């Protein structure tokens, strides 16, 4: 983990309130597993004391670049949306533990399920699975058509399905409605699933397909390094808690309570 002044190589809007930023820095050499995140300081850190945790969407170690995708939800991310190409930002990272890309072998099948701003970390995962010859089935959930992003990018790596709550594109409803449809058609055969999204989506996913998979939690975070215990969640098999920013954010679905 490093704290580094990095250069913004790109910062563009890709969907409603959603932006893609490319960051260049030496910390990228330490990025290894899909699902890790960075903590970005907002301005000089005086007006906005807490950094903003943003998942890493793509890793390019050859060019020392990472791509992050974020949504404007408050003053911090609004500030980020106004950062220009060539500006410097203070980045702490990489942080957390990501998905186990070695949990499947060649010719096995992975089911990737993302909801909203939980979609981005699955892109690097799909890319790495593709390189290893692992088939991927990808399901992406959004509220509406104007919030959809990266559908075409994911299609490069596997069968890709989109759901929207209002039915403006893809299957009307939730990611689990796509799953039910594929199950009814006997078109959903996979060895393990990998997911990231809001708590209701993760709960519904586990109810639909069981616990043999990975979930990435989106708990609110403060320090990002496990020191403040602001982002803990409860373990299933013992009366204990785990720090999402340090021990996660990716867990086996069978290991933690989804609350």
From Swiss-Prot:
HAMAP family in alphabetical order: DHODB_Fe_S_bind
Cofactor(s) needed: [2Fe-2S] cluster; FAD
Protein's name according to its UniProt entry: Dihydroorotate dehydrogenase B (NAD(+)), electron transfer subunit
Organismal lineage: Bacteria, Fusobacteriati, Fusobacteriota, Fusobacteriia, Fusobacteriales
Every FAD-binding FR-type domain range: 1-101
Keyword tags: 2Fe-2S, Electron transport, FAD, Flavoprotein, Iron, Iron-sulfur, Metal-binding, Pyrimidine biosynthesis, Transport
Subunit: Heterotetramer of 2 PyrK and 2 PyrD type B subunits.
Pathway(s) served: Pyrimidine metabolism; UMP biosynthesis via de novo pathway; orotate from (S)-dihydroorotate (NAD(+) route): step 1/1
Organism, scientific name: Fusobacterium nucleatum subsp. nucleatum (strain ATCC 25586 / DSM 15643 / BCRC 10681 / CIP 101130 / JCM 8532 / KCTC 2640 / LMG 13131 / VPI 4355)
Cofactor binding notes: Binds 1 [2Fe-2S] cluster per subunit.
């Amino acid at each position: 983990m490093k704290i580094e002044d990095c250069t913004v190589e790109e910062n563009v809007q890709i969907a409603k309130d959603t932006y893609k930023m490319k960051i260049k820095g030496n910390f990228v050499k330490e990025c290894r597993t899909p699902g890790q995140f960075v903590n970005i300081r907002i301005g000089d850190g005086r007006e906005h004391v807490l950094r903003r945790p943003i998942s890493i969407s793509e890793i390019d170690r050859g060019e020392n670049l990472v791509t992050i995708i974020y949504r404007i939800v408050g003053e911090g991310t609004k500030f980020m949306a106004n950062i220009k190409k060539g500006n410097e930002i203070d980045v702490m990272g990489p942080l957390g533990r990501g998905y186990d890309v070695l949990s499947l072998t060649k010719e096995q099948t992975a089911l990737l399920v993302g909801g909203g701003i939980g979609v981005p970390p699955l892109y690097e995962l799909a890319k790495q699975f593709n390189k290893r010859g692992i088939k991927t089935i990808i399901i992406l959930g959004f509220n509406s058509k104007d919030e959809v992003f990266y559908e075409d990018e994911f299609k490069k790596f596997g069968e890709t399905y989109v759901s929207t709550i209002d039915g403006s594109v893809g299957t009307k409803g939730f990611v689990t409605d796509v799953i039910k449809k594929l199950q009814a058609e006997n078109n959903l055969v996979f060895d393990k699933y990998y997911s990231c999204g809001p708590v209701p989506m993760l709960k519904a996913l586990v109810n639909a397909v069981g616990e043999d998979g990975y979930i990435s939690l989106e708990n609110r975070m403060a320090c990002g390094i496990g020191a403040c215990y602001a982002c803990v969640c409860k373990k299933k098999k013992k009366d204990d808690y785990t720090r999402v920013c340090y021990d996660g954010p990716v867990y086996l679905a069978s290991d933690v309570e989804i609350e």
